Amino acid sequence: MASGYRKLGRPTDQRRAMLRNLVTSFLKHGKIETTVTRAKETRSLAEKMITLAKRGDLHARRQVLSFVTEETVVKKLFDEVAPKYSERNGGYTRIYKMGPRRGDGAEIVILELV
């Protein structure tokens, strides 16, 4: 039984770069529109970043900085997003299905912070 993560049809370096960009955009804007599988992978990583930010120490900040590509987003994550979820253990995100994409019929969803 395969488990772990989705390959998303890309080599490792491209997949990692794409997911870093998706997580950064998601944390910056609070919601993004993407495909189901990308959203599920992004959700997993974003929730890990929020949990790290809730710790609030320097090591956690550096760990988040090594993944999130913009310092302003890290500042927002630690100062605004993490305190909002201080009482909640996980489940910081929600996925809404929007139907198929017009061009290729891929299932589109909106991933947003709860």
Swiss-Prot record:
InterPro entries: Ribosomal_bL17, Ribosomal_bL17_CS, Ribosomal_bL17_sf. Disulfide bonds: none annotated. One of its GO terms (molecular function) is structural constituent of ribosome. Pfam families: Ribosomal_L17. One of its GO terms (biological process) is translation. GO terms for cellular component: cytosolic large ribosomal subunit. Keywords: Ribonucleoprotein, Ribosomal protein. PROSITE patterns: RIBOSOMAL_L17 (PS01167). Transmembrane segments: none annotated. Belongs to the bacterial ribosomal protein bL17 family. Part of the 50S ribosomal subunit. Contacts protein L32. HAMAP family: Ribosomal_bL17. This is Large ribosomal subunit protein bL17.
